[in-house]
């Protein structure tokens, strides 16, 4: 039976850090652990407004690599696009192969799912039951890969990761908690995206103004606010939401952002392995025989996690 750790509401006025520390998932890890953070996948309906469509194969190659190499996958919010889409039916149909891979992570107890503003509906305790009823109206076995996963996993607002060698904690959450339009007013923003911006998407380069990923100045302000949260808490925090991949130098900050999966021709992730943290880009390349392949590059780090803990201690 699915357990939800927060009702589908959001307010910047509440102390969301304490809420995450109290109700979030707890993960202990050490220098032998391998963890990957991926956010803002925005799995959609396969149509023109499906932001993942162009990077589907890159994303699939990345998660297959992480499954094969025994990583714990933390989906850090906005995994499914539930602002543009009223339910999961088209998403379940178009991404059957993806949900099969994610289910393999879950069978190994190596999958954690965080909800963001675009999939806040997952915080509703009856959400999966409602989706199951919709699927049954379509066909008896429709959406079985998605349902097999979502009926057997918890959705959290955030995760507390404890690094055993140092006895220090890392906080991971989507990041919309500091964004008024996408937290307090998320239902209004969803309405605007679903019924106004989506039909206009693609027309003369139109972008939804409520999205930090479509508004660089807004995204940067949110990133600055999240860095302030990290300094105030004196903790490493890892977020998504703004789609801006961020990897600070040890002496510069404690706020990391894993970027997104929807920018043209590449996706970004954050990896923790051997006590080191790295920012990784996956993209399409062409070899000398004109064959396309997916290439993984480290674009930030690797840096020792303990160096950031030491920096936080001296703030």
Region roles according to the model:
Residues 1-75, 79-315:
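Extended recognition/assembly regions associated with phosphoester-bond processing machinery
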């Amino acid at each position: 039976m699915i357990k939800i750790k927060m009702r589908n509401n959001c307010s910047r006025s509440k102390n969301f850090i304490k809420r995450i520390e109290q109700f979030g998932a707890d993960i202990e890890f050490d220098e032998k652990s391998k963890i990957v953070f991926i956010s803002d996948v925005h799995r959609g309906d396969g149509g023109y407004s499906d932001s993942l469509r162009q990077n589907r194969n890159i994303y699939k190659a990345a998660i297959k690599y992480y499954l094969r190499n025994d990583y714990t996958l933390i989906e850090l919010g906005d995994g499914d696009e539930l602002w543009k889409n009223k339910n999961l039916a088209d998403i379940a149909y178009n991404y059957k192969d993806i949900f099969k891979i994610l289910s393999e992570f879950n069978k190994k107890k190596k999958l954690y799912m965080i909800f963001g503003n675009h999939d806040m509906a997952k915080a509703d305790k009856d959400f999966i039951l409602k989706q199951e009823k919709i699927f049954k109206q379509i066909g008896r076995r429709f959406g079985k890969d998605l349902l097999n996963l979502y009926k057997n996993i918890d959705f959290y607002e955030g995760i507390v990761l404890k690094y055993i060698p140092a006895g220090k904690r890392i906080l991971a959450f989507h990041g919309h908690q500091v964004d008024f339009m996408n937290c307090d007013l998320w239902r209004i923003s969803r309405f605007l995206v679903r019924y106004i911006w989506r039909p206009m998407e693609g027309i003369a380069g139109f972008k939804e103004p409520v999205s930090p990923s479509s508004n660089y100045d807004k995204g940067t302000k949110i990133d600055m606010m999240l860095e302030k949260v990290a300094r105030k808490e004196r903790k490493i925090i890892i977020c998504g939401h703004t789609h801006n991949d961020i990897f600070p130098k040890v002496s510069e900050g404690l706020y990391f952002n894993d970027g997104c999966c929807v920018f043209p021709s590449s996706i970004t992730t954050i990896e923790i392995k051997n006590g080191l943290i790295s920012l990784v880009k996956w993209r399409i390349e062409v070899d000398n025989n004109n064959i396309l392949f997916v290439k993984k590059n480290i674009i930030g780090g690797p840096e020792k996690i303990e160096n950031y803990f030491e920096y936080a201690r001296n703030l």
